[in-house]
């Protein structure tokens, strides 16, 4: 079975092509937009961001299963976040039990709600001035 070719063309193509030569049983993933949210050097969440026009993603896919297991083993909540082009909406999905403690079910949030959530998982409240003016549209 052949390994899928590099699709985007903007990653380090040489390494991507080389790794694919290592075979089907040596899978790896270039995590396109994976964020490690942290506070004072301590990880607080892993978030996989996808643009609204990106292909659908499934938590059952081996790539997601590896990411979920990584978070669970590290005792870090893992979320998927699909965002609109204008950042007016973030569809958040908790992917492991630790994430479900913070957010029991999938939820659509405004940018303000999402930013507030990110502050809250760090134990903080966002400063009021953060939402003033042009910094963050509401």
Describe the predicted segments one by one:
Residues 14, 32-34, 53, 98, ...:
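Intrinsic disorder/low-complexity detector
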Residues 31-53:
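Conserved catalytic cores of phosphodiester-cleaving nucleases, focusing on short active-site segments
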Residues 34, 46, 68, 77-82:
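Short, hydrophobic/aromatic-rich beta-strand segments within well-structured domains
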Residues 66, 97-138:
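Helix-rich interaction surfaces within compact, conserved domain-sized segments
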Residues 26, 53-64:
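Active-site-adjacent loop/helix micro-motif of nuclease/hydrolase catalytic cores
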Residues 1-27, 40, 125-127, 133-134, ...:
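Acidic-basic catalytic patches of nuclease active cores, encompassing PD-(D/E)XK
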Residues 71-97:
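Nucleic-acid nuclease catalytic cores
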Residues 60-76:
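Basic, amphipathic alpha-helical patches used to engage nucleic acids or provide basic targeting signals
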């Amino acid at each position: 079975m052949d390994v899928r070719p590099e699709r985007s063309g903007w990653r380090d193509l040489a390494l991507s092509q080389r790794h694919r030569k290592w075979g089907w049983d040596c899978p790896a993933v270039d995590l396109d937009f994976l964020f490690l949210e942290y506070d004072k050097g301590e990880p607080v969440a892993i978030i996989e961001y996808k643009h609204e026009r990106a292909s659908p993603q499934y938590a059952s896919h081996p790539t997601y299963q590896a990411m979920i297991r990584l978070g669970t083993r590290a005792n870090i909540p893992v979320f998927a976040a699909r965002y609109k082009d204008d950042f007016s909406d973030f569809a958040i999905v908790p992917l492991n039990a630790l994430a479900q403690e913070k957010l029991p079910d999938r939820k659509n949030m405004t940018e303000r709600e999402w930013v507030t959530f990110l502050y809250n998982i760090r134990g903080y409240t966002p400063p009021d001035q953060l939402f003033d003016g042009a910094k963050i549209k509401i």
